[in-house]
Every structure is written in structure tokens, then in C-alpha cells.
Amino acid sequence: KGAVDNTSLIVVRDTSGSMGSSATGTTQSCFDIAKALALFFSEMLPKGSFANSWIEFNSVAKMHSWKGSTPYEKWTNDKSKYIGSTNFQSVIKLFCDIKQKGVNESEFPTGILCISDSEFNPTQLNSTNVKAALFSLRNAGFSKDYVNNFKIVLWNLQSNHHGSTTGKKFETFGNVKNVFYFSGYDGSTVAFLTGSDQH
């Protein structure tokens, strides 16, 4: 109940060291909750180069495909661990690298759903991670239309890894088009971004 039919947002899952901390209000780790949400949303990606996929990022980003025929098998076959820093820009670099390998822009997700405790590495020249990401996409040859409509959903799993201020940073100054902030544990809350009906 409350699930979306499909989404063109690919899940970007933070597996940095701080994700091993408990998520606020639960006995579960941010790592496990992010894994569950990643599995939930990747089931809804349309067919194509990114179907059944998710992106892991810590100090670097990697593309993964779930292995198995059931959610349980996919969960148990995922051997990722929490380690390293939270290099959000490595996700954008991965997008750019894939494009350079010849994948057509029309096959790319229209945005990312980043599940993290939001302790991103700082960017250079005091730019926000969002601004730096869009700049990199443009430089990699993505069309103006693609970049201007690229959605960045930052889903914060509040932890206390660095104390009470963990995950309370914003990556924008004021309202920015196609950038959304969420928190919590119910995947249906992003249905309005997908154009899908809820059930």
C-alpha cells in the first residue's frame, strides 16, 4: 500500500562509515534502512541500461545490479559494507563516465534519490554539492534540457554519528528548482515526483 508504480529516479545509497549508526527513532542502522529503500525503488526503474540497479557511494561511487529473483535473495546477495567518506560528487562523476562510454542520454534516469545521513564531503570553491553536480553534468555533454530538469532528492536518515548536528546541513541556498529534501522511512512519500498514482 502506498507504493508507486514506476520511477525514473535511480537510488543513490550512502555506504560511508557513519551509516552504521542507528537511525533516529529506530533500532535499525541507517545502512540497513537505506538498503531497504534502495531495493524498494530499484524494483520500479523502467527497463533499460539502469534497470534493477542502484548506485553505491562512499569515497567513490559504483553501479550495482541486484542479484536474485526475490527481494530476500537480492538483500542477502548484497555484500556492501559501510566504510569511507561521503563523496557525493563521485556519483555525478559516475554518471559522466557512463555517458562517455556511449549510453544514450534518453536511457539515463531523470534524477537521483540519494539516501544518506547527509554528511557530504565539502566541494571546492565553496560551491554546494548540488551546484557542483549540475555544473559537472553540463560539462560532460548532457543536454541543457536534461540538466535543467534533473531531479535531486536528498533523503536524510538522521543519525547521531557526529552528535546532534549530524545530517542537518543543506546543499542549497533557498528554494532551488528540482531539489527536494525528505526524511523518514516511508517510500511512498516521493510518489508525486514520479508522476505515478498511489495505491
Regions found by a protein language model. Give the residues of each.
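Acidic, glycine-rich A-domain
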Residues: K1-H199
